[in-house]
Swiss-Prot record:
PANTHER family with a match to the protein in the record: GLYCEROPHOSPHOCHOLINE PHOSPHODIESTERASE GPCPD1 HOMOLOG 2-RELATED (PTHR22958:SF42), GLYCEROPHOSPHORYL DIESTER PHOSPHODIESTERASE (PTHR22958)
MF annotations from Gene Ontology: glycerophosphocholine phosphodiesterase activity; starch binding
GO biological process, one term: glycerophospholipid catabolic process
EC number: 3.1.-.-
UniProt key word Hydrolase: yes
Record key words, sorted: Hydrolase
Domain of life: Eukaryota
Protein source organism: Caenorhabditis elegans
The UniProt record lists the keyword Transmembrane: no
Enzyme class of the recorded protein, top EC level: hydrolase
UniProt similarity note: Belongs to the glycerophosphoryl diester phosphodiesterase family.
Protein name: Putative glycerophosphocholine phosphodiesterase GPCPD1 homolog 2
PROSITE patterns, per database record: CBM20 (PS51166), GP_PDE (PS51704)
Length: 796
């Protein structure tokens, strides 16, 4: 019998030789790999050979033939389309009364991976932890994920908020027809939320709606001040409760004043829905604690000591303009000392610091609390919703350390490099030299175009007047002479066209060293050699096999009191421009984000559900000017912040780790990814130390592949997979080499294949990653020796 599995479609078809005349009604084994052909549909889908191999083998599978037709090869096609009821059952621990469990998946009944259209499950009355549901479908394979959600009210009605979701690279999967008994599938199967295929992977939700916001309130440093206490109070407790100022809050939690109560407008209070709210409860994370994850507040809050503890309070809301917070201060004995309100008028900007006086029960002010706040708004620059079919935000395949090209082929303005840093040519040079990823810095121009450049300022050269009505023309050498003045201007104050046309120099130019590239050279240059390429140009012109480590540059206050760049773009607007470029035009490219600004990291992770985020950390340093933000002051604090913010990992400064490697071990305990950057990586022995002894997941350094030749690990793994399939007699699908090119003249022009956030691009990216992640798995299945994961040690 000739057996061929074709591409998965809404109707799974089995093709066999016409002369056989019958099909076996029970399959006692799986088809060999050589018998399976993996075909690719136009939408990037296809039969997932590896997912099929993971499923338990089912015997005595009934085949119900509903229709017959002949294909071009005179084969009889038997279509199996009888409806099957698929059951879902999942156990979820520590669920709150206002939360429910949902299932989202690959067919329309399950929302086609759109969270807002997911199917709610019903709580089992006999087992309060278990949630159940079922659907009827005729598809061959069904993929799905569970998530925890709750409803909030907005002006447009009720909104489903994703609180926690299963963020596995591979969704759960079932072969509906093959695993069914009497047209019932998964009858006795009970899943455990967040656990699948021997792994645990749960991620926080993301912002889905234009009016959805996440509010973060932070207490740290000398945040609590009492007016009349000679000795500082210790172990005070702080609680923050959100409320909508349009509605009456529950009276039990508020201070009652001895001189009576204010008159309230009861008619207005009657407008509040009885069981719905515009905001979530507030959770708290203690970054100074060994377990910095968010959890529910106690009735008397959480302990805070000045200059010791770092608290972060978090809530979601759909009406930020009416959101206020009731802040209570308790003594160590858990008796309320005082309280105050943070009103919407205090939280008008997207970020800032507020100083609020708090009063006791008699209405007398007794102290002050200082609070930092951040408002994260939803990403609104996309053409459609963000789907849940594939995600890399929590995915990392453990292998030898990846090698990342710093600013492409290396720093060229203060060190020697073969190519000018942060140019298309430099990025492609690093890719040609075998870089797995390239790291570069992204910021915005005055006309809000994302460009690649490291520093926040440039030097503009201006010739001085010499009193002549018509000064004679000057050569470049004369322009480089003492006749020039240099004026420092922020990149944010120059349009892209100005950056392309003006005679600019790097800030280090007055102290120019030998063999160091100038920012702008004399004469004409090819476009790929010029500075200030746009992010869109990089996404479409750089070798698609090399991943991007996109450092989101945002200026910060330094310990010396100097700000890197004052009066910068508002954070939400800034991040949205960069994210929109990547989400629309990245295609299959591997992407990770990073930033020294912890708030930028939180925003990038909260606004999207696809790409991972690393926190860039300076730590304790003598080489660089440290930042004021306490979360960047030590590498250990950076680990706690990243763990609490649900980031993939931390990118450490080599200078700090060479003195104390413990932060890497701490990050490993949290299951986080660790990268390292820094000038110490100019030495090969330091690279080997971080790779082989500390076991970091990635190293970022200059002049990659110049001293020792190497190959991109993803290309090597793909070739190994093809070799394995070739040994087994199977073929592998051919994929497009790169995204369609796009003109760099218009930053808002999308390539034809990515004009919208399409399902096709997402499916392609997921399939590409799945194929490369299953090299070792496939090798084990085939029992073929002599193949291994791509070697990261360079060869001459």
């Amino acid at each position: 019998m000739h057996f061929t599995r074709r591409a998965v479609s809404p109707r799974a078809s089995f093709v066999f030789d016409r002369h056989v005349g019958t099909i076996n009604s029970s399959l006692s084994r799986r088809p060999r790999i050589s018998e399976c052909v993996e075909e690719e549909e136009e939408d990037g889908g296809g039969f997932d050979l590896f997912e099929e191999m993971r499923q338990p083998i089912q015997e005595n599978i009934p085949m119900i033939i509903l229709e017959e037709e002949e294909d071009d090869n005179d084969n009889l096609v038997m279509s199996v389309a009888r409806p099957v009821r698929v059951h879902f059952a999942v156990d979820v621990e520590n669920l709150h009364a206002h939360q429910s469990v949902y299932v989202v998946g690959s067919n329309d009944v399950l929302g086609t991976w759109e969270a807002t259209r997911a199917m709610p499950l019903v709580q089992d009355p006999d087992r309060f932890m278990r949630w159940k549901g079922s659907i009827v479908t005729d598809v061959h394979q069904l993929k799905f994920r569970y998530f925890i959600g709750y409803n909030l009210m907005s002006d447009q009605g009720e909104r489903l908020i994703v609180d926690k979701w299963e963020a596995f690279l591979h969704p759960r999967s079932t072969l509906c027809l093959a695993e069914s008994r009497n047209d019932e599938c998964r009858v006795d199967r009970v899943d455990l939320f967040g656990y699948y295929a021997g792994r645990k992977c749960v991620s926080d939700g993301w912002l889905q709606y234009p009016d959805e916001n996440q509010i973060l309130l932070r207490l740290h440093g000398n945040a609590l001040k009492f007016y009349k206490t000679a000795k500082e109070r210790k172990n005070c407790r702080v609680k923050m409760t959100p409320l909508d100022v349009r509605f009456k809050a529950p009276p039990s939690g508020h201070i009652s004043f001895s001189y009576g109560e204010d008159e309230e407008d009861e008619e207005e209070d009657q407008n509040v829905p009885s069981n719905k709210c515009t905001h979530s409860a507030t959770h708290v994370a203690v970054l100074s604690d060994p377990r910095p994850k968010f959890y529910d507040q106690e009735d008397t809050g959480v302990t805070f000591n000045n200059n010791k503890d770092y608290l972060v309070f978090r809530t979601h809301c759909l009406a930020a303009e009416f959101l206020a917070f009731y802040i209570e201060i308790f003594s160590e004995e858990r008796k309320r000392i005082g309280a105050c309100y943070a009103l919407p008028s205090s939280l008008q900007d997207a970020s800032g610091i507020i100083h609020l006086p708090f009063i006791n029960s008699s209405g007398r002010p007794i102290g002050q609390v200082s609070i930092e706040y951040l408002c994260v708004r939803a990403l609104t620059r996309l053409d459609g919703p963000q789907f849940m079919d594939q995600t890399y935000c929590r995915h990392w395949k453990k292998r030898n350390a990846l090698e990342v090209g710093h600013r492409g082929a290396g720093n060229s303005y203060t060190k020697f490099a073969m190519a000018r840093e942060n140019t298309i040519h430099s990025l492609n040079t690093a890719a040609k030299n075998g870089a797995d990823y390239v790291e570069f810095d992204v910021q915005l121009t005055k006309d809000r175009i994302a460009v690649i450049y490291h520093d926040f300022h440039v030097l503009v050269s201006v010739a001085r007047r010499d009193g002549l009505a018509m000064p004679p023309p000057m050569t470049r050498e004369q322009l480089d002479s003492s006749n020039l003045d240099y004026h420092e201007l922020p990149v944010k104050d120059l349009k892209l066209s100005q950056l392309k046309l003006l005679m600019l120099d790097h800030l280090s130019f007055p102290q120019k060293k030998e063999n160091v590239k100038k920012l702008v050279e004399a004469g004409e240059e090819e476009e790929d050699f010029k500075p200030f390429p746009t992010l869109l140009e990089a996404l479409t012109k750089v070798d698609p096999d090399v991943g991007f480590n996109v450092e989101v540059k945002y200026p910060m206050m330094q310990n010396n009191g100097e700000h890197e760049c004052d009066h910068y773009f508002e954070r939400n607007l800034f991040v949205d421009v960069i994210l929109a470029d990547v989400m629309k035009h990245a295609g299959n490219r591997r992407i990770m984000f990073s930033s020294f600004d912890p708030d930028i990291c939180s925003m990038v992770a909260t606004k999207q559900n696809k790409y991972p985020v690393l926190f860039l950390c300076v730590g304790e340093t003598q080489r660089y000017t440290p930042f004021q933000d306490q979360r960047t002051s030590t590498s250990m604090t950076a680990v706690n912040f990243a763990a609490g913010a649900d980031l993939l990992g931390v990118n450490f400064n080599s200078e700090d780790l060479l003195k104390d490697p413990m932060p890497v071990k701490k990050a490993n305990e949290f299951g986080m990814v660790t990268f390292v950057w820094g000038e110490d990586l100019d030495k090969k022995e330091n690279i080997n130390y971080f790779k082989k002894e500390l076991g970091v997941d990635g190293v970022i350094y200059d002049r990659i592949g110049e001293e020792e030749r190497r190959r991109n690990v993803f290309i090597v793994e793909r070739e190994q997979k093809r070799a394995l399939l070739s040994c087994s007699g199977a073929s592998t699908p051919q994929r497009a080499a790169s995204p369609s090119p796009v003109s760099s003249e218009n930053n808002n022009t999308s390539p034809p294949h990515s004009a919208k956030l399409t399902r096709n691009a997402q499916s392609d990216s997921a399939l590409l990653e799945e194929n490369e992640d299953d090299v070792e798995h496939l090798s084990d299945k085939l029992n073929i020796t002599g193949f291994q994961s791509a070697p990261m040690v360079s060869t001459k």
